[in-house]
């Protein structure tokens, strides 16, 4: 299959139109929109309820650790999809590589369990 530079022209035109639309919309709204400022408009709004106290409550590091572990294992599971699509073409060599990959994931998961990273004590 031979690729020509003109084959990419519709893609670049679409990207240019999308970026141009966004830029023109932002510039147009700043010129056309009202610019009245008042104390009532500048107040924080949260579902019509008056805010009380400070909104900056410290979170436990456990939440961030669980979120990072979720993203880590979620991204690794995404690698299973191309393997499943090309399973027949990869043959036994692809199967062995995937077993090694999954065993590394399992070792990492057991390490997390051993370090008690998911316990909420």
Swiss-Prot record:
Keywords: Cell inner membrane, Cell membrane, Membrane, NAD, Quinone, Translocase, Transmembrane, Transmembrane helix, Transport. It comes from the Bacteria. Its EC number is 7.1.1.-. It is an enzyme of class 7 (translocase). GO terms for molecular function: NADH dehydrogenase (ubiquinone) activity; NADH:ubiquinone reductase (non-electrogenic) activity; quinone binding. InterPro entries: NAD(P)H_OxRDtase_bac/plastid, NADH_UbQ/plastoQ_OxRdtase_su3, NDAH_ubi_oxred_su3_sf. GO terms for cellular component: NADH dehydrogenase complex; plasma membrane. It is a multi-pass membrane protein. It is found in: Cell inner membrane. It catalyses: a quinone + NADH + 5 H(+)(in) = a quinol + NAD(+) + 4 H(+)(out). Belongs to the complex I subunit 3 family. NDH-1 is composed of 14 different subunits. Subunits NuoA, H, J, K, L, M, N constitute the membrane sector of the complex. This is NADH-quinone oxidoreductase subunit A. It comes from Flavobacterium psychrophilum (strain ATCC 49511 / DSM 21280 / CIP 103535 / JIP02/86).
């Amino acid at each position: 299959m031979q690729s020509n530079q003109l084959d990419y022209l519709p893609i670049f035109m679409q990207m240019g139109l999308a970026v141009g639309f966004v830029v023109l919309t932002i510039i147009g709204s700043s010129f056309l929109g009202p610019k009245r400022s008042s104390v009532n408009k500048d107040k924080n709004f949260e579902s019509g309820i008056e805010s009380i106290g400070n909104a900056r409550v410290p979170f436990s590091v456990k939440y961030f650790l669980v979120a990072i572990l979720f993203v880590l294992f979620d991204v690794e599971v995404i690698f299973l999809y191309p393997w499943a699509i090309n399973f027949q073409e990869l043959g036994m060599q692809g199967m062995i590589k995937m077993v090694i990959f999954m065993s590394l994931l399992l070792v990492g998961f057991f390490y997390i369990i051993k370090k008690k990273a998911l316990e909420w004590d």
